[in-house]
Amino acid sequence: HHPEIAKGNYNWDYELFRFLPTYTKAKNDMDRDKLIISWITSLGEIEQCKNCKSTDKNAFLKPDLNWIEKQSDALKQKIFHVYNNRSQSKHYYVGMAGGVGNPDFKNENPYSSMTYPDEGFRLLSLFRYWNMIHYFFPYKHLMDEDWNKKLSEYLPLFIHAKDELEYELAAIQLIGDIQDTHANLWGGGDKTDEWKGKNYPPVHVRFIEDQLVVTDYYNEELQNEAGLKIGDVITRINGKPIQEIVKEKSKYYPASNVPTRLRDISADILRSNSNKIEIEFISKDAKTQNKSLKLYQKDSLNIYRWYRKSEGKSYKKLDNNIGYVTLQTIKEEDISRIKSEFIDTKGIIIDIRNYPSTFVPFSLGSFFVSSSTPFVKFTNGNVDNPGEFTFTNSIEIPSQGKTYKGKLVVLVNELSQSQAEYTSMAFRAGDNTTIIGSTTAGADGNVSAIMLPGGLRTMISGIGVNYPNGEETQRVGIVPDIEVKPTIQGIREGKDELLAKAIEIILKE
């Protein structure tokens, strides 16, 4: 807020370090307030702001300045003087990305050479992140807990983090509290990765019907050695029940909602630094069995995190004159062919249980609307009044060429994230769309990167994404019209139950 800081006239990180030793010696609140007031004064004269606007009364989110109201009169007056004459337009530390309006956190030193930052830099990490979220996160109001209480809660964790791993885990827990699947430790988490285990299982597992189920082999040739069948349910690892492990690990797996957290836990739950783990599992004969499961180094397996990458064609005709399209491999040049080849089909199934390889909301979405149809509007933050978020106008899908007359069924699940969710919103605007499946990842909106001391790299959803009526998609995800989830029985039989349901919907007169 302070114009001198906004101009880049102070290295704000180092100013904190210069101030902290004096601050920690304050004997009481009165001493403390005097120190803060004299610190603010030392930054230089603040000219009266002639173009500072008050918060828009229709703003979707308003700056949370309640903490100022709780200060002593003298300190309150000083801080409000800064706020009322705050920096406008260009800012050294934060801007808004052109065209989109998500925050661009500039000139924040990542201090990458310190793998384990000292106490001062760990505090800086906490303060930097807390403020970025407080003023520039569009979904602060959707958190389960009060963000204002988080500083005091995390101070001991950051101060007492005794090594690199504890510092990384403290950061992950803080990041997890904003409940945004885009927000995780995307870089610099080397010790966390080691802690999860360097050896991997030969099988892919997923949580299905609240149980940990074997769904695939990474390498077919290891099938016999693994001694597990597709559909086997793993109930214990090294003697510990799966639900207990999930409970312990949850705080280290940031996510917008529970299905997405389980998605991410399942990718790591069988990892270990040992060469084998002991598992208890139940096969389809309902017998409980125990075995040692051999683990492998990552590079010796054809490992995938969410789904096996396919190189195949993105569209095909199914029986009964039904078109099928997967966005996993869709190319720009496929779109005109899909429109011409599928125009007379009974229905089209679009599979977005993946991350789209091409951006299609408008190019393909226009095939399903008979007139220009609004499908989304955004909330954007404001560098001139940090903490204020206002709605943009709705964005419409134009109707172009011939409109498809059949039924459109869209498949989604917890693998549908970000652009996949945005694309689902576009298809939902269609004349005759049914979305089926289960809770999506609940993280939409262009991402903003955040660098923290120690070279930690994280991100946030930087704009709010809403339906035209204002309904939110963050955390709740894209709510399907018909909920369909895979079953253990279906996995054992090799069925795609969502696809089967989609076909049934299309064939129903």
Give short role names for the model-derived ranges.
Residues D13-L20, R32-L43, I79, L126, ...:
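Short amphipathic alpha-helical coiled-coil/interface segments
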Residues E145-E153, I245-Y252:
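Short, conserved phosphate-binding/catalytic loop or strand-edge motifs used
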Residues Y129, E225-N257, I349-D351, F427, ...:
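Conserved PDZ fold ligand-binding element
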Residues I482-E509:
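Low-complexity, Gly/Ser/Thr/Pro-rich intrinsically disordered linker/tail segments
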Residues N432, G442, V447-I488:
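C-terminal structured "cap/appendage" subdomains that terminate the fold
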Residues H1-N11, L16, L20-K27, E119, ...:
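Cleft-lining beta-strand/loop regions that shape enzyme active-site pockets
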Residues L61-G98, M114-M132, D193-E244, E332, ...:
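PDZ/PDZ-like domain segments forming the peptide/carboxylate-binding groove
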Residues H1-K106:
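Cationic-aromatic interfacial patches
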